[in-house]
Amino acid sequence: MQRLQRGLVLLLWAGLGILAITALASFYVDLAWFAELNALPVLWTRVLARWGLGLGAFAFALAVVGSNIRACWRGASTAGAWAIALGLSGGLAWSLSQHWFALLLWLHQVPVGESDPIFGRDLGFFLFGLPFWETLQQWCFNLVLLTLITVALIYLVELGLSEQRLTLALSLFAQRHLLILGGALFLLRAWGHWLERYELLYSTRGVVFGAGFADVHATLPATTLMSGVAFLTAVGFWALARQGIRFNLPLFKSWCPAWASSLLAPALLWGAYLGFGLLTTRLYPQLLQTLLVTPNELELERPYIEHNIRFTRAGFGLAEVEVKPFPEEGSLTWEILQQNQSTLRNVRLWDTEPLLATYRQLQEIRPYYQFPYVDVDRYRIGGELRQVMHAARELDFAQVPPAAQTWVNRRFFYTHGYGLTLSPVNVVTAEGLPDFFLSDIPPRVSPRYPEVAQVLRVEQPALYYSELTTTDVFVGAEARELDYPAADRYVYSSYRGTGGVPIPHLWQRLLYAWHFRDLRILLSRELSPSTRFLYRRQIRERVRQVMPFLLYDQDPYLVIQGGRLYWFFDAYTTSSRYPYSEHLPGFPFNYIRNSVKAVLDAYNGSIDWYIADPRDPLIQAYARIYPTLFKPLEAMPEPLRQHIRYPQDLFRVQVQQFATYHMTDPRVFYNREDQWQIPNQFRKRRRLPMQPQYLILTLPEDPQKGSPNQPEFVLLSPFTPLNKQNMVAWMAARCDGENYGKLLVYEFSKQRLIYGPEQVEARVNQDPAISEQIALWNEHGSRVNLGTLLVIPIETSLLYIQPLYLEAEQGRLPQLTRVIAAYEDRVVMEPTLSQALEALFSPTGSRRSNR
């Protein structure tokens, strides 16, 4: 027996030792990784906040649970009582420690400077304070509830379940103990009801999101009253505990056992509380909503509709949208086109999907190189802004031949991708393929474009950090890395950057081997004192590890600057706690700002975090929590700042909200008299909403502005009326310089018909010459793909451009074969954009050749 006990003790200590080593290895891996990024304060803030909150909660819970257990379990062993107390306290402490960031936000909150319309409290209370107080109230309630249940079970188990022993169990001391805990529960419910008042600002009862007439005039006073009722119920429980009241009236003696009579008084109090709550907070508001509000909805809900409109526009960054009428004078002519060559030279003829397929066929070079995505950017080349598309040539180890997927190759040989391919959006070769500015391995600037050599030179093309990089590698070791394949040989290299963690000591290798469950890290002879370990190289994982509280745009993009490659991330601060702000279906937030731009060095893996919207209260609080992490946007080098762009994910959300919330008159909003929608386009054999498009264009001139507008990089999306196809407006997000982040909406006159994208698409499909040519191609073994229909504002008119791609049935090399152009009621199809525009507008051009 003693051997068994000793064996169990040894097994227990061995298990604890394994857990300790695992925790130590995991912590060291994090510590070294954050140190590599110069972000140790971020890690220490996280650790200290979590452990500080957890230990504080543990001590408080242990005091509450332990004292109550010892009070009722007076004859029990100390070990048994403490085992229960430690178990409950540990679980409760762990649950509260998960909310450490809510505590930090509360401690570092900032005022928003605007108050809610119902309680008059600064919005910072709802963003920072209310979530923390609700978490704390719920935790305290759970603590007392679990204590009450535990104490009640101890009384029952300790004294048995017979009526005689139950009577003993419910002695005066036991009654008082349970009643005191019951009173504490109701006191916490009183606190909970008080906090529930503020939750009315997120009500979904009325015609719009947020507190409506019934919420303010019925639910709010009822919830306030219930807070008082819960407090009085708590006082009633404590009064019963002090007096030890039993219901020994003759009415009850005849049928009520002695032990049950002890529960009758608190049960009546609890029942009265529930009944009163049901009447006041459920039945009365519903009756008021049905009998008074619904028949007079617009009249009674009007001020609350105004609140919803104002706060939704503020929550989604739409409060400062500048709405202008689109100029109607004049029409588009050949002469006007010649004056807008900067726009025409940047018409995007390549869609991402066909261009990506072409890049993969022509430029991946080796099977283990992959182009995961195509991105859009702009560069100033020869003094002119040029829109380009590019893709990073990333290493995908999964594509290495299976026979070569060895541990050595995974860890030492296949370590990085190489360079990128870049082409202008509007240039096509005679074969219908993209004409590259930058291509091949090593990256080579096309001799046809010598002016781009200085701007697009790439001196360090190695991509050690990218979107497909999921392997952890050792660099600077004895083994050579594959740098890139040349024509008749392979070129090898050795990492010379600052990324990764040095592992010169055996104990470090031991911890990494333990953490990654890979004994070969400890045994490999390839490792040397100069070896660096690069892990967490997938760029999305990398930024999320540092700042998991930001929401990241799904489209990071690569930028060339100073011969190096950088990944740009758009990051958002979000909240679901902005009062009166309407949620979009499928999105968990009702407040969003693009407050952070993160720049990640593709060679070294370092990350710089810049505050793009210093007015955002959330990022102000984050900057207080992590004072050494964030930099002002002005600290970003100017050449990099020229590549900041308005993010598509944010713009999509704003466009969807603005389709409804451009209506600021409550009556118009209530009736949805002017509801807009995003037009659809036929893609992949089904109708899909049009996606916003980056364009370089010159915005219509403002008569009050002295100087003419210059070409600029914008993100554009059109609007049509709900269930209609004519265009009513278009929205643009500006991306350049001091105008970055400004939103413009140009509205068309309601008396003028402007063809929308779906109508233009229908005209293209119905054009006899175009339809005949497409059918002819399809009959000869080719597959015709119509690209994105582009809406291009030029001065006071709209021009539509749509590329057409041909792809062999058995091939994967799309070719840009034709360009369709449409203006007003005219449609043409020509081999090139210039020919299409000439056919459409030139006095000497053929109006409808449709070749």
Swiss-Prot record:
Source species of the chain: Synechococcus sp. (strain JA-3-3Ab) (Cyanobacteria bacterium Yellowstone A-Prime)
Pfam families with a match to the protein in the record: UPF0182 (PF03699)
HAMAP family in the record: UPF0182 (MF_01600)
The entry's keywords: Cell membrane, Membrane, Transmembrane, Transmembrane helix
Top-level taxon in the UniProt lineage: Bacteria
Entries under NCBIfam families matching the protein: PRK02509.1
Lineage: Bacteria, Bacillati, Cyanobacteriota, Cyanophyceae, Synechococcales
Record protein name field: UPF0182 protein CYA_1810
Statement: the UniProt record of this protein carries the keyword Membrane: yes
Principal subcellular localization: membrane
Transmembrane segments: 7-27, 47-67, 76-96, 141-161, 168-188, 220-240, 259-279
Family the entry assigns: Belongs to the UPF0182 family.
Membrane topology listed for this record: Multi-pass membrane protein
Location of the protein in the cell: Cell membrane
